[in-house]
Amino acid sequence: MKDRYILAFETSCDETSVAVLKNDDELLSNVIASQIESHKRFGGVVPEVASRHHVEVITACIEEALAEAGITEEDVTAVAVTYGPGLVGALLVGLSAAKAFAWAHGLPLIPVNHMAGHLMAAQSVEPLEFPLLALLVSGGHTELVYVSEAGDYKIVGETRDDAVGEAYDKVGRVMGLTYPAGREIDELAHQGQDIYDFPRAMIKEDNLEFSFSGLKSAFINLHHNAEQKGESLSTEDLCASFQAAVMDILMAKTKKALEKYPVKTLVVAGGVAANKGLRERLAAEITDVKVIIPPLRLCGDNAGMIAYASVSEWNKENFAGWDLNAKPSLAFDTME
């Protein structure tokens, strides 16, 4: 059987990425051009800046991904691309490049939901057994997803306000930490003690919903009041207390979901899945099911995860037309 090569594009936010996947599971290349330095001085992602950066580097990323994979344009079998959710301008750059490549070479175009990409990045660790449950935690999303089979996703719980990664970045900004603040807060948390009593919203409620706005506000108020009084608070203890509250919420809701949906596998993915504290809590407390977390290089936004997610769409022949457009608010359980 002839080998299949999928060229995948990811430009939903501030990472320009192009990857090549051979057949179902051999990731030959995964080129990522980061924009962190450009957005750092703004304390967050500036959509217009992100779009311009994507335009500047997308062609070079395509060339590098093909070269690293050891293939030519003529070897590519199909093109996969993120079409949502994300920043509309950023998404359009990847979509335009992917459609142009596919059209020029007469190849099928595979539409991929960004969050499906995060989830299916776990396929890089080992073949996934369905049904499974997934906890997706990133800067824009916090969701519990039931997956009956590859490509069939159902959101069973999500945040009512802030995403967990968003809360990390806002708290980090208050403390004057460098954007993105997640890794630094995690490191500082391991040096401090959980001494501040931050709220764990909805932790005892009988649902699978999350809320982090109250925790974020409590943190900001404590920090602000201390500044007003001229008091000094331990940054390490603040981070430890904040992270403990976050993890208590995530673990409580995940355990409740596992009780409601008896599965053998839990996938934890998204940028926050790189958090050491989360990985430690999962290892210590989730012992009845197999926990699969993508490697660190596949936790953040990258085209490799889009390539993995595209396989199930390829198998279903779920191809898009040339009118495929960016859908910045695309629902996770919606596919073209």
Curated annotation (Swiss-Prot):
Pfam families according to UniProt: TsaD (PF00814)
Entry-linked InterPro entries: ATPase_NBD, Gcp-like_dom, KAE1/TsaD, Peptidase_M22_CS, TsaD
Keyword Iron listed: yes
CC cofactor: Fe(2+)
Protein localization: Cytoplasm
Keyword Cytoplasm: yes
UniProt GO molecular function: iron ion binding; N(6)-L-threonylcarbamoyladenine synthase activity
Protein EC: 2.3.1.234
GO annotation, biological process: tRNA threonylcarbamoyladenosine modification
Keyword terms, alphabetized: Acyltransferase, Cytoplasm, Iron, Metal-binding, Transferase, tRNA processing
A GO-annotated cellular component: cytoplasm
Highest taxon listed in the record's lineage: Bacteria
UniProt family annotation: Belongs to the KAE1 / TsaD family.
Function of the molecule: Required for the formation of a threonylcarbamoyl group on adenosine at position 37 (t(6)A37) in tRNAs that read codons beginning with adenine. Is involved in the transfer of the threonylcarbamoyl moiety of threonylcarbamoyl-AMP (TC-AMP) to the N6 group of A37, together with TsaE and TsaB. TsaD likely plays a direct catalytic role in this reaction.
The protein's name: tRNA N6-adenosine threonylcarbamoyltransferase
Organism the protein comes from: Streptococcus pneumoniae (strain JJA)
Gene: tsaD
